[in-house]
């Protein structure tokens, strides 16, 4: 495995955003010579990325046959309000994968974006906005290179007025127009098929966020799969001992979401 890092700055857009890739090398003469690309957009309240949990999650999907790329997007300490910069960062990451598909052994037509918590907000919004003229203009990339083929959301922030961020000061650091960044309000017929999971007892990002996005996808007949697990705290990642930052995170039942998501992708791309 080769671990690579790419800064996402362009001539017209300067950013500290980085894309870290965990690149597998195909086994000679194996029937598997290409891998599904997965861009992982972690949480961290737009202030940081939990590196240790993020690595474990990335490697878990790598072990399941993905070429995994972790997006370190723009934080509120670097730009306020932070939006739309994380969306531009993600657009540039998607475009880079499409450009490097042959060199990195990628199935470019099976590109999945996975986002958790605040990263889920970035991912859900990107699912809404990838085709728009304004994102094409800001990223400098044609829309046909920006399309996600599938989206996975874990305990995502969807609406800035549904419980997270917790206060107006923090919301203002995220967006100057919360309505524009209500991901449920901007779902449309071009959204990608979406897999979502959360827990009923999440006390940080209420379950209503995930449900509102599900309802919006339903209204537009976008294929989806939704799992609301009975209990579990916020920030579970792959929900096993490797990422258990406190005791309640290690939950084998919730950890099934990983296999469920992989099975869903197998069915989607068969």
Name each model-derived stretch.
Residues 50, 71-108:
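Catalytic nucleophile-loop/oxyanion-hole region of alpha/beta-hydrolase
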Residues 34-43:
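Short beta-strand element of the alpha/beta-hydrolase
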Residues 1-33:
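N-terminal cap/lid segment of alpha/beta-hydrolase-fold proteins
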Residues 203-212:
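Conserved alpha/beta-hydrolase "acid-adjacent" motif
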Residues 92-170, 174, 178-179:
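Primarily recognizes the serine-hydrolase "nucleophile elbow" in alpha/beta-hydrolase
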Residues 190, 196-198, 202:
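Short beta-strand/loop motif that positions the catalytic acidic residue
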Residues 218-270:
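C-terminal catalytic histidine-bearing segment of alpha/beta-hydrolase fold enzymes
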Residues 51-69:
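Short amphipathic alpha-helix adjacent to the substrate-entry channel of hydrolases
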């Amino acid at each position: 495995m080769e671990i690579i890092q790419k800064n996402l700055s362009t001539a017209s857009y300067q950013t500290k955003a980085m894309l870290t890739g965990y690149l597998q090398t195909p086994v000679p003469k194996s029937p598997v010579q290409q891998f599904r690309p997965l861009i992982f957009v972690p949480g961290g309240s737009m202030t940081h990325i939990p590196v240790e949990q993020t690595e474990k999650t990335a490697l878990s999907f790598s072990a399941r046959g993905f070429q995994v790329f972790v997006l370190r997007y723009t934080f509120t300490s670097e730009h306020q309000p932070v939006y739309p910069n994380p969306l531009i960062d993600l657009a540039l990451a998607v475009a880079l994968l499409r450009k490097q598909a042959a060199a990195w052994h990628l199935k470019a037509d099976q590109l999945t974006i996975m986002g958790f918590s605040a990263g889920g907000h970035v991912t859900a919004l990107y699912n809404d906005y990838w085709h728009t003229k304004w994102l094409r203009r800001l990223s400098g990339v044609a829309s046909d290179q920006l399309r996600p083929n599938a989206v996975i959301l874990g305990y995502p922030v969807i609406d800035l007025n549904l419980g997270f961020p917790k206060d107006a000061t923090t919301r203002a650091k995220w967006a100057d127009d919360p309505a524009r960044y209500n991901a449920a309000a901007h779902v449309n017929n071009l959204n990608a098929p979406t897999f979502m999971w959360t827990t009923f007892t999440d006390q940080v990002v209420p379950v209503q966020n995930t449900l509102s996005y599900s309802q919006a996808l339903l209204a537009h007949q976008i294929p989806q799969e939704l799992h609301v697990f009975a209990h579990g705290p916020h920030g579970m990642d792959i929900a096993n001992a490797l990422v258990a930052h406190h005791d309640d995170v290690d939950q084998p039942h919730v950890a099934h979401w990983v296999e469920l998501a992989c099975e869903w992708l197998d069915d989607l791309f068969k």
